[in-house]
């Protein structure tokens, strides 16, 4: 299944919309650049069930999306450990642009 997460709210807030999402292993999350770019999506190496820097890196998209309407997607591996994965936008992390994806077991 594919889910969409907007980068920046429709009202221009520095948030992921939705900020929390529950998926299954093998699902895809499309990150759609919406408002107040630039944005990127970085998964926290310490805040994932495997505490794996390699897994976090493989899920992340560090390149900045500059224009509204640009998107990038992440497919969670079929063997992704169940639990909570925290991600953030590097330029706007200090403003609270952080989200969580829960992979159901």
UniProtKB/Swiss-Prot annotation:
<feature type="binding site">
    <location>
        <position position="92"/>
    </location>
    <ligand>
        <name>Cu(2+)</name>
    </ligand>
</feature>
<feature type="domain" description="Plastocyanin-like">
    <location>
        <begin position="1"/>
        <end position="105"/>
    </location>
</feature>
<dbReference type="GO" id="GO:0009055">
    <property type="term" value="F:electron transfer activity"/>
</dbReference>
<dbReference type="InterPro" id="IPR008972">
    <property type="entry name" value="Cupredoxin"/>
</dbReference>
<comment type="function">
    <text>Participates in electron transfer between P700 and the cytochrome b6-f complex in photosystem I.</text>
</comment>
<dbReference type="Pfam" id="PF00127">
    <property type="entry name" value="Copper-bind"/>
</dbReference>
<keyword id="KW-0793">Thylakoid</keyword>
<dbReference type="GO" id="GO:0005507">
    <property type="term" value="F:copper ion binding"/>
</dbReference>
<dbReference type="InterPro" id="IPR028871">
    <property type="entry name" value="BlueCu_1_BS"/>
</dbReference>
<keyword id="KW-0472">Membrane</keyword>
<keyword id="KW-0813">Transport</keyword>
<dbReference type="InterPro" id="IPR002387">
    <property type="entry name" value="Plastocyanin"/>
</dbReference>
<feature type="binding site">
    <location>
        <position position="97"/>
    </location>
    <ligand>
        <name>Cu(2+)</name>
    </ligand>
</feature>
<comment type="similarity">
    <text>Belongs to the plastocyanin family.</text>
</comment>
<keyword id="KW-0479">Metal-binding</keyword>
<keyword id="KW-0249">Electron transport</keyword>
<protein>
    <recommendedName>
        <fullName>Plastocyanin</fullName>
    </recommendedName>
</protein>
<dbReference type="InterPro" id="IPR001235">
    <property type="entry name" value="Copper_blue_Plastocyanin"/>
</dbReference>
<feature type="binding site">
    <location>
        <position position="89"/>
    </location>
    <ligand>
        <name>Cu(2+)</name>
    </ligand>
</feature>
<keyword id="KW-0186">Copper</keyword>
<dbReference type="InterPro" id="IPR023511">
    <property type="entry name" value="Plastocyanin_cyanobac"/>
</dbReference>
<dbReference type="InterPro" id="IPR000923">
    <property type="entry name" value="BlueCu_1"/>
</dbReference>
<feature type="binding site">
    <location>
        <position position="39"/>
    </location>
    <ligand>
        <name>Cu(2+)</name>
    </ligand>
</feature>
<dbReference type="GO" id="GO:0031676">
    <property type="term" value="C:plasma membrane-derived thylakoid membrane"/>
</dbReference>
